[in-house]
Amino acid sequence: MNISLKNTVFVFDLDDTLYKEADYHASGVRAVAKKVKSLYGVDVYSYLQSCIKHDEADLWGALCLHLDLPLTEKQSFIWEYRLHQPDITLSRANQNLLALLEETAAGLAILTDGRSTTQRLKLKALGLAHLPCFISGEHGGADKPDPRRFQQIANKFPNYDYLYIGDNPNKDFLAPNQLRWKTCGLTGDHRNIYSQEVSHLDKSYWPQYWITELTELTGLINA
């Protein structure tokens, strides 16, 4: 894959692409534990960590039972998690890459699924709030692989080539492949939220290229 920097709009997924979503989850758990401590005087952080370690399917429901609270309180924990100020950062390498692309590429944008407020809080914490961001929660809940947000990016940056970088082959690459974009998958590790197994998927779902670090994009770029 060869990429012309000045003629390509770079579009990134957010979670498990620009940063590790597991870091956001850990940040949210800390925020809920802090809120519980302030309301009830009980330190539940170790309990929550134990639940996570043992793959508790209903973390906030389990917390209600642990605190002897009605299960209706579960929603308050969920919203505390969703609306907390995330303690997440970009790696220095990813900061430098995005700065380079913002300065020299034809365009730079983010396309991500999720709730508007939650995703915007993540972008702010990562220092990316100034970038054009196309969030499914702001577009009628049209999660990937719905093609409409990809088409909107093409309309915003017309007459260029487009590259989408994501991590989840189950949904990230089908639409841009169909729109004749270039697609690049970022291989993850055991901390990734979603599987990257592609053997069960039609090849139309596969990225055209795989990289192990975002910085490998620089090796694919032609000025």
Predicted regions and their residues:
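Acidic-and-aromatic substrate-binding clefts and catalytic sites of carbohydrate-active enzymes
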Residues: 51-54, 86-90, 141-142
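A metal-dependent, Asp-based hydrolase signature
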Residues: 35-38, 42, 49-83, 100
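Asp-based, Mg2+/Mn2+-dependent phosphohydrolase catalytic module
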Residues: 1-7, 102, 109, 115-223
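Short, acidic loop-to-helix structural element flanking the phosphoryl-transfer center
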Residues: 82-109, 147
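Small/polar loops that bind or transfer phosphate-bearing groups
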Residues: 20, 110-111
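Active-site neighborhood of HAD-like aspartate-dependent phosphohydrolases
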Residues: 1-45
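Alpha-helical elements of Rossmann-like donor-binding domains used by nucleotide-donor carbohydrate transfer enzymes
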Residues: 27, 31, 62, 96, ...
